[in-house]
Amino acid sequence: MARHKRKRRRDVNPILLVIVLVLLLANVVVFLRREGRSLPGEGVRLPDYVTADYLVKNEWSRPGTPLTKINGVVIHDVGNPGTSAQANRNYFNGLALSHETSASAHFVVGLKGEVIACVPLTEVAYASNERNADTVSIEVCHPDETGEYSAVTYERVVELTAWLCGTFDLDVQEDVIRHYDVTGKICPKYYVEHPEAWEQLKADVEAKMAP
């Protein structure tokens, strides 16, 4: 008479089972956080010295494209000496009707240190070519053709850049760049032609961030 061998039941190690369940749960939590996470600029309160005067939504200067990453700050100059922050903001806004070009910036810093926010930090601005998708842009007014900022404008640029770096955990030396560093355009003019002044500006930003 043939004997049927009884199959030996393998006991599941309860500790191993717990570890597997914990790992699965952790992966689910990470997935849900990624799916539900907000944009990096969402809920960020602007400094008191910034006036929010956002452009109308339009395909030429404020397309409304979500800014899903903030990996840097790009500094520009406006290129039209003696003009105010408000004038440059209005120019960007007018592109909705003129269709002259695609251009804008998140911020414009004026000749008297005033700052206008033109595009929310949750949206892409048309300023820095391929880096539009992951940077915040600052256009800076200047009094003359040299492109050098006035003292009050310079201090505000330093202050605003330091705030952005602190808010979005950016490295000043690596993540604060010129328009020139993206496209080779001579912008901001003075700080391309005087690289030592550019290095000093970044050093001043770092000093502003120091506790």
Model-derived regions, located:
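Basic/polar, cationic surfaces and motifs that engage anionic cell-wall
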Residues: 2, 8, 12-18, 31-51, ...
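N-terminal catalytic cores of peptidoglycan-degrading enzymes
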Residues: 2-128
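Soluble periplasmic/extracytoplasmic beta-strand elements of cell-envelope proteins
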Residues: 74, 108, 137-139, 177
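Cell-envelope and extracellular/periplasmic
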Residues: 79, 131, 136-145
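Short, low-complexity, polar/charged sequence segments that are solvent-exposed and flexible
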Residues: 92-98, 126-128, 135-138, 155-159, ...
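Short acidic/His/Gly/Ser-rich catalytic and metal-binding motifs that mark active-site loops
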Residues: 127-129, 185-186
